């Protein structure tokens, strides 16, 4: 970058950073954006021509490169549209590469590779396997949106698990999820819309009221990325779920009432599933 303005020269130099898994990150957003795009483009090109990592072999350092990508997204560009970068990279490949057999399904292979690397990165950082899975599964449903928040969600989840009540919370949510899975096996048409007029028992009425309150609060907290307080909402809903399961027969004979109760449970699970999947926690 000789003869270029200082900021241009700095961007050119730093777009190669980080040079190693733990190397120094770019110092400016411009350098980070170019570095991120360049690294994703490199991964796309290698996959497109069949040079993806296999077993322990990674001659082009793509696994290490992914660590740099995740670090930059976390520190600089939390809302980076990774899937769009992948799409643009593959779209602009030379036609002769697009004709290769290895180009087929390259996007799916790249996405699978990146998610596997993200899981490995956070497990190597000391988070438990089920914690990582719990946070990554909801993120996967949203493409790559929000992967910059995975680390902070994991940190809050790790702290929440230290609470004495958290194991009981996991148990009650697993029970709720099992009912949903049982209903799906019976091909019941589950929605998250509850018909209030069909709620008869005091316990289900109280659960529904709390569900409405917590859902509104959750939406506000998640919009503000206040994940610690969002997790605390589990404590607000738990006693009402306990009371519901103790006093209400969910799988009753009346199909309308049964489906309505299942829908109530499904709505509660969906609210928390948007950022943490409690069903995979051990």
Describe the role of every protein-language-model region.
Residues 1-282:
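Amphipathic alpha-helical "coupling" segments that flank catalytic cores
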């Amino acid at each position: 970058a000789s003869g270029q303005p200082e900021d241009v020269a700095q961007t050119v130099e730093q777009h190669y950073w980080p040079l190693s898994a733990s190397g120094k990150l770019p110092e400016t957003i411009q350098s980070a954006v170019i570095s991120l795009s360049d690294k994703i483009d490199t991964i796309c090109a290698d996959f497109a021509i069949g040079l993806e990592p296999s077993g322990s072999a990674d001659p082009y350092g793509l696994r290490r490169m992914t660590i740099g990508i995740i670090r930059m997204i976390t520190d600089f560009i939390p809302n980076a549209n990774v899937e769009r970068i992948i799409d643009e990279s593959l779209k602009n490949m030379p036609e002769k590469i697009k004709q290769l057999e290895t180009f087929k399904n390259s996007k799916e292979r790249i996405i699978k590779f990146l998610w596997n690397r993200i899981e490995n990165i956070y497990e190597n950082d000391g988070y438990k396997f089920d914690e990582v899975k719990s946070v990554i599964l909801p993120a996967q449903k949203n493409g790559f949106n929000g992967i910059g928040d995975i680390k902070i969600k994991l940190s809050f989840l790790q702290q929440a698990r230290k609470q004495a009540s958290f194991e009981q919370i996991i148990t009650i949510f697993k029970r709720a999820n099992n009912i949903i899975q049982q209903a799906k096996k019976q091909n019941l048409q589950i929605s998250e819309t509850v018909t209030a007029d069909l709620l008869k028992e005091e316990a289900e009425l109280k659960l529904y009221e709390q569900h409405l309150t917590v859902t509104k609060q959750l939406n506000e907290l998640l919009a503000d990325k206040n994940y610690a307080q969002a997790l605390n909402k589990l404590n607000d809903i738990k006693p009402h779920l306990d009371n519901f399961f103790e006093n209400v027969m969910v799988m009753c004979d009346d199909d309308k009432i049964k489906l309505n109760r299942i829908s109530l449970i499904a709505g509660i699970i969906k609210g928390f599933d948007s950022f943490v999947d409690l069903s995979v926690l051990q």
